[in-house]
């Protein structure tokens, strides 16, 4: 059974369903999602080329699967390409990935912020370097396995929308995608539930049909991100004081890299009449400031490096400050997100992404927060 036709590959200037002579480059990670995208592209009638970036290979080192773009993943991608009868190329981007993603990850933690390396990777390696490769190969578009939707708006420009399957939506991680990139990108899985994607892979006899999903941070073995940061920025692992909101020393911590704003676990301080949470990190003094939950309330988040793809929109919007958080009503004014109601656990280094319904309007990196005026005892 062949792969179904997918309208996502429609190209401007071509009649619907007419892709003869077109060329599509597919970003293939070796997982089931990108493999099905390659199958859908091949079924469209366009010449399809699979491209895999060798980014980081710790899979062999930790003896398990689930690490993105590792050696086994490259072999899986090549096997899928062979079965589909499409060309497949591998490019070594380990050095670039190390410098632009891993080093930035360590720097952010050392500065007391909470980074999102997947956004940095999409922003740089995947949607900049991979774009260059696709254009050099003469592709009419670049297709990926992200669960988001590309919708052509009333003005004829592409918009970024949430995936149809909310449990799989990855729009938060793609807020930095530019207008020009959206014009070139295709996301064939945005309207599909994940079980259907696996069904297509099984129907086509792809060996990755039952392959587990990759972990979120591909270069962090077993989720121990602190060991990565400690190796690259050892000063971030130095012990320091735990202090209350009034500056009173309450105890010692084993390194700021083990904490993020809003965290409760691991503080290990007894005698407090109410639970204590991380309110902020002060890397200059190595102090961990803790307080009650109400001390986490913020009224606004100041953003850096804002990417806005909501030109012309002036209606109500919502903001999302963590990948798994629910969007909340907010306003966007002068580079700041101002929440209608106090928001909790907003960490510098994270992203604030703005939505109008399902449409992504843009977002930016949280530089600082403005405390809500709630009564907080010292």
Swiss-Prot record:
Compartmental location: Cytoplasm
Interaction with tRNA (site feature) positions: 146, 350
Gene Ontology MF term list: ATP binding; tRNA binding; tRNA-uridine 2-sulfurtransferase activity
Keywords: ATP-binding, Cytoplasm, Disulfide bond, Nucleotide-binding, RNA-binding, Transferase, tRNA processing, tRNA-binding
InterPro entries: MnmA-like, MnmA-like_C, MnmA-like_central, MnmA-like_central_sf, Rossmann-like_a/b/a_fold
Residue ranges, annotated region (Interaction with tRNA): 168-170
Binding site for ATP: 27-34, 53, 145
UniProt-annotated catalytic positions: 121, 218
Entry GO CC: cytoplasm
Known catalytic reactions: S-sulfanyl-L-cysteinyl-[protein] + uridine(34) in tRNA + AH2 + ATP = 2-thiouridine(34) in tRNA + L-cysteinyl-[protein] + A + AMP + diphosphate + H(+)
Primary location recorded for the protein, binned into one broad class: cytoplasm
Single GO biological process annotation from the record: tRNA wobble position uridine thiolation
Family matches, as NCBIfam families: PRK00143.1, trmU
Functional note: Catalyzes the 2-thiolation of uridine at the wobble position (U34) of tRNA, leading to the formation of s(2)U34.
Protein name in UniProt: tRNA-specific 2-thiouridylase MnmA
Organism of derivation: Rhizorhabdus wittichii (strain DSM 6014 / CCUG 31198 / JCM 15750 / NBRC 105917 / EY 4224 / RW1)
Gene this protein is translated from: mnmA
